[in-house]
């Protein structure tokens, strides 16, 4: 908390909506920072999930609306003299919201993250996190009406990232290239390297590897 007092938040893009920050350390402790009416608000984030508006406290309260959800498959039951059975596995999550609004994304992230199995290695955990994050890709155009032509990608998912705090490695993929890349922070001499902006994609194109069958 003492270090946060030295941070200055500067708006860069006037199109930016309300911003929410999630900060974590290698022990797993997380806090959320939201600025409301110019005032910083800090919350302990024991769930480890964060999306956009409304505020974090609202999202945590909204979780109670989905108390009926659980991982696994619903057991068969009878309705009068009719036997009812699940159509498929995972029906315990029947009713989980699937739209792209922040409240729905928060619910999906909360249940997917808490139901995922513990992995033995860091890279396995990173790969699993990307599988979860695949559920939150927003395609270009979905925020526009049918009469509008998208001229930009303000709300589409431009990149997805996962961070290994223990080994200090940042993994990411982009909307142009779904291959996972990484930045090893330990390999960077922050005392010597100059401040710079590096594009996430040197070439905005998805590489496709041909499979040959002889």
Model-found features: residue ranges?
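Short, structured patches in soluble enzyme cores that scaffold and shape functional sites
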Residues: 23-27, 34-37
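Acidic, His- and aromatic-enriched active-site or binding-groove loops in soluble protein domains
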Residues: 33-51
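C-terminus-biased signal that marks the final domain/tail of proteins
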Residues: 6-8, 12-17, 26-28, 48-214
């Amino acid at each position: 908390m003492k270090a946060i007092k030295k941070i200055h938040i500067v708006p860069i893009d006037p199109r930016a909506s309300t911003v929410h920050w999630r900060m974590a350390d290698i022990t797993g402790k997380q806090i959320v920072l939201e600025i409301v009416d110019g005032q910083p608000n800090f919350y302990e984030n024991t769930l480890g999930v964060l999306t956009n508006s409304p505020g974090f406290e609202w999202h945590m309260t909204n979780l109670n609306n989905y108390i009926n959800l659980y991982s696994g498959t619903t057991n068969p039951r009878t309705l009068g003299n009719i036997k009812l059975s699940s159509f498929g596995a995972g029906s315990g999550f029947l009713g989980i919201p699937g739209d792209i609004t922040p409240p729905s994304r928060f619910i999906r992230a909360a249940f997917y993250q808490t139901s995922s199995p513990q992995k033995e290695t860091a890279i396995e955990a990173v790969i699993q996190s990307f599988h979860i994050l695949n559920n939150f890709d927003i395609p270009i155009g979905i925020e526009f009406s049918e009469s509008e032509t998208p001229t930009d990608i303000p709300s589409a998912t431009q990149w997805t990232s996962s961070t290994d705090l223990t080994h200090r490695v940042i993994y990411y993929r982009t909307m142009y290239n779904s291959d996972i890349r990484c930045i090893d922070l330990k390999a960077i001499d922050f005392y010597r390297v100059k401040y710079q902006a590096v594009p996430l994609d040197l070439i905005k194109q998805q590489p496709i590897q041909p499979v040959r069958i002889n």
